[in-house]
Amino acid sequence: MATSMAQTIYVCKDGDYTTREIAEGLELSLTEGIDSITFRQPVMEKAVKITFQEDKASVVIPSFIEGVTCSSGTSSDVVLTSTNLTDEIIYRVSGSSRAGSLTINGDYKLTVALDGVSLTSAKGAPLNIQCGKRIAVVMADGSVNNFTDAAGGTNKACVYTKGHFEFSGAGTLNVTGNANHAIASKEYCQIKRSVKAVNILKAANDAIHCGQYFQMNGGEVNITSTTTNDAIQAEYELDDNDAIIQDPENTGGIVIKGGSVNILLANAEDAKGLKAEGNIDITGGTFIIDAVSNGTRGMQTDANMTISEADAPTTITVNAKGTKCTVAEDAADPHNCMGIKVDGNLTVNAGTVTVYNTGKKAKGIKVGGTYTLNGGTVNAVVDSAQ
């Protein structure tokens, strides 16, 4: 007998099973001593392929994928809608367009696989995921992926989802947010250990903005001086009545377990490098934050901060070079530049924290609650209430 396609077969001999890959068209014969041969159909990857070619894009939806349709306002603005609620579909994206975008609508978790894509949108977000579930963004090893939106747009971010982002893969993501945030998610945002780099080249608002929490397990995040508000901001997710949603994941916090974070706040008066409504928990990583603009703060939390080396060595360096904030909205609170501000308690268990407050009247560390040094080294003047 001949196989009609490449398959995996199970061969049973004397009660023991082994597997073999059989190429298409290969003749098989049942020889003496073989009890049976069982064919297993190959697993077909449920992937939609989107390839951008400047003013056009090709979309391939395999016939065995159910519930996915494509519509486009223009040939390079791709809109995909999925009604499939049982299968996690992969959207493989490559190519480039100087006037293109990808919008995905759906109600089930999905994966966006980036392999050297470069999109600039003249209308809104070049990557817009209208799905309130888990959105895995996987970058191919060694790939460089670029997204840029247009100034004056009404989109919430250059790279946006109404669900939660999980970035992974040993590639690079470059985001230029000319309209609003660079990256934003309504729910949490995670950067996995495998990520090579996330580079925010510009943000008209926050560089990375998320609800629920922000978590970084490794990789590298670089945020440049063209960000005009906070670098990384996590806030509580709210319901339609602006009340905090009661959910264990809705912590409003920042958790960083490793990797490197490099932030330059040189064009963002009153901005913060890390800003959390909830707790900031650092258990590993290397941080270099240059707070150059007036009134800037390297790190700020409305709650508590804990620093340790539970997951990796921790080194935090904040250069507080700015002076007093002068923007009109802060006239009632003309605060100075500061390295770290903790409204609650600050606990340092391990690691090295250094604040260089070289700006005029710049401050080191201010703690509204209790400051506890259990281990590690803190090279800064700490002003605590207790």
Give the role of each language-model region.
Residues 8, 36, 90:
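A residue-level signal for beta-strand positions that form part of recognition/binding surfaces
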Residues 8-25:
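Short N-terminal segments immediately surrounding and downstream of signal-peptide cleavage
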Residues 42-386:
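A composition-driven surface/loop motif
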Residues 1-8:
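Bacterial Sec-dependent N-terminal signal peptides
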Residues 23-37:
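Structured surface patches comprising rigid loops and adjacent beta-strands/short helices at the edges
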